[in-house]
Amino acid sequence: VRVVEPFFWRAFGWARLEVDVARQSVSREADRDAQQVARTLIPVASRDQALWLLARVMPDAHPNPPPDAGPPSRARLKAPLSFHFLAAWFGQRYVYARTGRVQMSTIIVPLVKVQSVRLKSGPLQRTFHVATVDVDTAGRRWQASARCRDEHEAVEMVRHISERARLSRRVPPPRPANPIPVPAAG
């Protein structure tokens, strides 16, 4: 699932919620438009309403990054324009990755859906001692990428995410105990 907050929407507190569906083939342009609509859970809503719907689709998902979710300060040299918008973190059930200066998007991947976790580090990244962790799923539209992470942190992320993904496939996910109230339109 992806929470998208384009630049001009943020002033109004608007967001879009999308879902990446596995194995959708596109044969014609008309089918492409229909599939885009089918992938959009809510095209435009207040951020509170989008987060309410997210809580219904993915219980216990928290798309707001914790204070330590950002990249190390030396990554500012590698990604000067997007540095403040990069974040990555994971919990007991989900992996989160936030990117985008103009169109900020937070990708939320259930650990049970993780197919592979990869560590990438090009020559420029190695110069700054940072790396990227890619979390792959069966969907084809996007992937969760933890960009510009400290190289040691990235290795630990790969290890922890892989281990938690393996464990999560063994245990059925819990259901929310209380119904979630609908936020007021505002």
Predicted regions and their residues:
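N-terminal basic, Ser/Thr-rich segments that initiate or prime the first beta/alpha elements at protein or domain
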Residues: 1-186
